[in-house]
Structures are given as C-alpha cells and as structure tokens.
C-alpha cells in the first residue's frame, strides 16, 4: 500500500479538504485514458490499492497503469475501549483529498474497450463519482 517514507510531522492537525475544482492534475498527461473524479472525497490508501489491483487484473499483462494520487495525510485513532484524554491516538491510515476533476488513474497501451472496462472496475472501488476521459477530451476543459 502507498504511504510516505518520511513525514515532517507524524500526527497532523485537523486537515480540511477543499471541495473546489482541481486546476492542476485535471487532464490526462501520461496515458491515453483516465479516471476523473466528478465529486470530491477523502480516498484511503487501501481504496487506491484495491482500484489499482482491479485495473491491472482486467488489463492482464498488457498496458501500463499510472496512479496520479498519493496518500499524504495520516488519520489517527485511539483503540476501542480507551477512555478520553491521555493524548492523541496513533496514525492508523493514510488518506488523500481528491478534488473535483482530479485524474486519479491513467491507462495506456491497451485497446479502448479494455481500458474503459478496466477503469470502470477500478472506479467502483473508490468513494467518489467518476467519469472516463481520453487524452483529447482533457485538453478542452
């Protein structure tokens, strides 16, 4: 699973994610087809990994998958049954904030039918609404 090698602070303050549109990372740059977010949400490292596995299994041995999002923020939690107080909990999961129009995954080297089907399967693993775009569609947004 994806997580940072090092962070400046292990436990961040409350991180708020912006629900506005993404102005960077909103076009297909490296592949031919992309999975673009239509809504904003927090995406967990496990969800990113589940989507990546679903996409690569559908594509078989052909083509490339490019992951365009990375979980930078840690989410802390305390164990169940622990009383209030005595400090902040330990980091449990890693998240990223996905804005509207962010391209999350890109696919290249496969036919359009396989690429659309693979991205559809991967999109169902994510907590955001999405659409599939091509490299030419991303230019005119």
Curated annotation (Swiss-Prot):
Protein encoded by which gene: rplP
Alphabetical list of CDD domains matching this protein: Ribosomal_L16_L10e
Assembly and interaction partners: Part of the 50S ribosomal subunit.
Family: Belongs to the universal ribosomal protein uL16 family.
Listed GO MF terms: rRNA binding; structural constituent of ribosome; tRNA binding
Protein name, as recorded: Large ribosomal subunit protein uL16
PROSITE patterns recorded: RIBOSOMAL_L16_2 (PS00701)
PANTHER family in UniProt: 50S/60S RIBOSOMAL PROTEIN L16 (PTHR12220), LARGE RIBOSOMAL SUBUNIT PROTEIN UL16M (PTHR12220:SF13)
SUPFAM superfamilies cross-referenced by the UniProt entry: Ribosomal protein L16p/L10e (SSF54686)
Swiss-Prot/TrEMBL keywords: Ribonucleoprotein, Ribosomal protein, RNA-binding, rRNA-binding, tRNA-binding
One record GO biological process: translation
Record function comment: Binds 23S rRNA and is also seen to make contacts with the A and possibly P site tRNAs.
InterPro entries referenced in this protein's UniProt entry, alphabetically: Ribosomal_uL16, Ribosomal_uL16_bact-type, Ribosomal_uL16_CS, Ribosomal_uL16_dom, Ribosomal_uL16_sf
Matches recorded under HAMAP family: Ribosomal_uL16
GO cellular component term of the entry, any: cytosolic large ribosomal subunit
């Amino acid at each position: 699973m994806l997580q940072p090698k090092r962070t400046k602070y292990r436990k961040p303050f409350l991180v708020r994610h912006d629900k506005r549109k993404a102005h960077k990372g909103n076009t297909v740059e490296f592949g031919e087809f992309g999975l673009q977010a239509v809504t904003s949400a927090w995406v967990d490292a496990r969800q990113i990994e589940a989507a990546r596995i679903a996409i690569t299994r559908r594509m078989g041995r052909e083509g490339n998958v490019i992951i365009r999002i990375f979980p930078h923020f840690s989410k802390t939690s305390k164990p169940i049954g622990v009383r209030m107080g005595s400090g902040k909990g330990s980091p449990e999961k890693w998240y990223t904030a996905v804005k509207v129009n962010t391209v999350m995954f890109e696919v290249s080297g496969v036919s359009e039918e396989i690429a659309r089907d693979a991205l559809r399967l991967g999109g169902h693993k994510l907590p955001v609404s999405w659409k599939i775009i091509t490299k030419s569609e991303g230019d005119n947004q």
